[in-house]
């Protein structure tokens, strides 16, 4: 044993090292107890602890777990735009892990919502990588601040459930770097998650678990990741290849440790690589020892329920509020229609399914608060046809009410881990019920329960108010009552565009793929990056959300702070008679670019609570990355010189003010050669001078003159200069030779 407090890889035999790279059972590390390395528990939990009651036996049961606080899934939390609140959720989750002796909680999942039909959208954050990364980092930092580990997942490009165990996500390098990697990258660089879970799918033909470029070259060497990488459950198909790629831990165990031993002995695994992977597992255990050594700890159930309550309040997005139908007056005659009001859908299905410590429905909350309301279920929470008797009862109940609160949405069978949705619509029987009620009473507020966006446009005309409540966790009932009756103002903002029609989504042409692959043909134009760039009509834009208050944004100023950095300031004022919160959003719009870029991209946001008449100055620092795109030519981030517009507003389509900043650019340039086009020479700082010389020498009669008309200039622009002889015969050869010779002289002088 070494002199350190805990064993290191140098204290282990080859067999013991190999054993650390596989689990002990479905929910435990293997450990080496004889060397003082315990086999701690790891378990599910993107939005709360799901410790299966069968965990002690190593079995899996998705619906039978110890009671834990069920916080709103990421579909709701993401709409809070409140990283500080999300950090508190993370802290609470960690405390519950400490009580249950869970060393690592498996989450958060930060895969991009490429398509709203994705079956797991309820536990992912956004269509925007900046928002996803800057929110989900709160879970990671909050959990790990208490000495419990997280598992950032699913790395990478796990954006659908259809064929997820084997599908190849075929994605350009630029789209990976700009859309599918940044949330992971930001969290790695700012919070260092103790574990990362690789995805099931292949990326450009290579399984994530066996992808050394992904797990080592990018994750560790480029981003500086210090933790371990584990497989998703059953995603490791070749232990030797995966370990060599940078996978520390296979889960669950395949009981093939001998494969690692044999490979280490015959040279297929280098000793240093096995040592690195095993030492990573020891380091993980050591990080969690203190928290796992706390005995008789009990978390505060009520305090955690209050965190869930606040999270649920801030998760709701008010989409429509005609005639100020919300908030509802305390003395109003209220009808509540919809089974969701009595039997709430508070979480998604699959591995994140939690047994809550408490559960209070909206109807229970009304009763507890002494609010009188008539109720009719209206429909059943299944995919069966409409029940005429339930419909008739609901219409009669709603007929004479001052306000009808209709709870509509997706039943659990409609969205879950394991399959993708087939439609954006809510069940037809619910829409027909809404229309029937609206025929008798126009004062309707629809309260939606769903894990991903649903079509609103087909039925929105039948309601004066629409409150998107997502899946609110265990405290959704009280939170809904607080918002609906005006105790608090809604403050949520959409983290995902609501399209007019699912076929408007740019990914639909390649969704969900075919014959084992899906081509991400939309490239970087995901979500609002597509809709806003191509001016497509949407139902509700990214970042949108109404309030009971009104706000004004002014005093926007952008100051250049470096060659390619800027500082943004703005003042936001509550101009209403309601205390409320507003989220100010900053977008960066490029000017002229060498590649196709989105119209604008989110690069900053700040949620601020303001009392009536109160103002606050807020500021944002935009680093070089905020202005950059991934250049496949340079294989690196690239900032072009020129003007950029900084937009400040409250959604991607509600911009209050803009300011322009001129950047120097990063000066990147590839050496020019005979295969560089005439246009590339003309755009290059050095090449442009040589192009000018070509025209000047032609005027002087020292070189053949280039054709000088609009058509030929366009023709030349995309022509490599070694093709000019095809256009001008010997004259083209002379021009090409002159350009290359002049370039060589300049390069020689620079050296």
Question: Model-derived features: where do they sit?
Answer:
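Conserved, compact domain cores that house catalytic/ligand-binding motifs in diverse enzymes
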Residues: 678-746
């Amino acid at each position: 044993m070494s002199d350190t407090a805990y064993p290191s890889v140098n204290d282990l035999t080859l067999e013991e090292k190999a054993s650390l790279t596989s689990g002990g059972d479905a929910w435990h590390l293997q450990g080496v107890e004889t060397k003082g390395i315990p086999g701690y528990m790891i378990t599910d939990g993107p939005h709360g602890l799901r410790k299966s009651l069968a965990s002690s036996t190593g079995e899996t049961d998705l619906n039978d777990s110890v009671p834990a606080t069920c916080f709103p899934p990421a579909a709701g939390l993401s709409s809070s735009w409140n990283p500080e609140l999300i950090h508190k959720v993370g802290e609470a989750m960690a405390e519950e892990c400490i009580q249950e002796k869970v060393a690592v909680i498996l989450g958060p999942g930060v895969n991009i919502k490429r398509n709203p039909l994705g079956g797991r959208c309820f536990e992912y954050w956004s269509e925007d990588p900046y928002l996803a990364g800057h929110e989900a980092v709160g879970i990671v930092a909050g959990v790990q601040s208490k000495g419990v580990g997280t598992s950032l997942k699913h790395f990478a490009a796990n954006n659908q459930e259809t064929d997820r165990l084997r599908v190849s996500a075929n994605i350009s390098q630029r789209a990976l770097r700009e859309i599918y990697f940044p949330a992971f990258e930001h969290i790695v660089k700012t919070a260092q998650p103790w574990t990362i879970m690789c995805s099931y799918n292949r990326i450009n033909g290579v399984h994530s678990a066996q992808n050394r470029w992904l797990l080592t070259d990018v994750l560790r060497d480029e981003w500086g990741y210090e933790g371990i990488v584990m497989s998703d459950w059953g995603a490791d198909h070749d232990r030797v290849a995966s370990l060599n790629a940078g996978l520390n831990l296979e889960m669950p165990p395949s009981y093939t440790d001998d494969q690692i031993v044999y490979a280490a002995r015959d040279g297929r695994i280098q000793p240093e690589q096995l040592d690195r992977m095993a030492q990573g597992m020891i380091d993980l255990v050591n990080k969690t020892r203190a928290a796992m050594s706390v005995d008789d700890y009990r978390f505060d159930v009520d305090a955690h329920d209050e965190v869930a309550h606040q999270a649920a309040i801030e998760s709701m997005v008010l989409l429509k509020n005609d005639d100020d139908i919300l908030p509802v007056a305390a003395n109003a005659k209220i009808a509540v229609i919809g089974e969701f009001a009595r039997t709430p859908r508070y979480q998604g299905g699959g591995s994140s399914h939690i047994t809550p410590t408490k559960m209070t429905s909206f109807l229970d909350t009304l009763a507890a608060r002494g609010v009188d309301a008539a109720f009719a279920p209206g429909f059943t929470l299944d995919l069966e046809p409409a029940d005429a008797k339930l419909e008739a009862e609901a219409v009669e109940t709603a007929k004479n009410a001052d306000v009808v609160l209709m709870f509509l949405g997706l039943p659990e069978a409609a969205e879950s881990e394991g399959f993708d949705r087939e439609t954006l619509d809510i069940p037809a029987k619910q829409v027909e019920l809404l229309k029937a009620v609206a025929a008798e009473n126009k004062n309707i507020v629809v309260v939606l329960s769903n894990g991903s966006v649903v079509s609103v446009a087909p039925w929105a005309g039948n309601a004066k108010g629409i409150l998107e409540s997502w899946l609110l966790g265990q405290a959704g009932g009280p939170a809904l009552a607080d918002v609906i009756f005006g105790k608090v103002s809604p403050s949520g903002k959409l983290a995902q565009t609501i399209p007019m029609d699912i076929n408007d989504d740019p990914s639909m042409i390649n969704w969900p793929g075919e014959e084992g692959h899906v081509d991400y043909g939309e490239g970087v134009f995901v979500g609002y990056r597509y809709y806003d760039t191509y001016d497509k009509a949407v139902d509700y834009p990214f970042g949108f959300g109404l309030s009971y208050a009104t706000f004004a944004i002014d005093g926007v100023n952008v100051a250049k702070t470096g060659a390619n950095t800027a500082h943004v300031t703005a003042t936001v004022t509550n101009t209403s008679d309601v205390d409320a919160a507003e989220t100010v959003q900053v977008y960066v719009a490029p000017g002229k670019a060498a590649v196709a870029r989105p119209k604008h991209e989110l690069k900053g946001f700040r949620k601020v609570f303001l009392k009536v008449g109160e103002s606050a100055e807020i500021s944002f620092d935009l680093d070089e990355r905020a202005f950059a795109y991934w250049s496949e030519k340079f294989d690196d981030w690239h900032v072009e010189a020129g003007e950029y517009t900084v937009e400040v507003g409250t959604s991607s389509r509600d911009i209050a003010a803009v300011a322009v900043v001129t950047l120097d650019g990063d000066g990147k340039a590839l050496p020019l050669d005979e295969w560089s086009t005439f246009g590339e020479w003309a755009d290059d700082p050095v090449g442009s001078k040589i192009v000018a010389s070509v025209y000047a020498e032609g005027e002087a009669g020292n070189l053949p003159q280039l054709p000088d008309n609009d058509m030929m200039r366009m023709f030349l622009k995309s022509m490599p200069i070694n093709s000019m002889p095809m256009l001008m015969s010997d004259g083209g050869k002379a021009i090409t030779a002159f350009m290359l010779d002049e370039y060589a002289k300049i390069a020689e002088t620079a050296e």
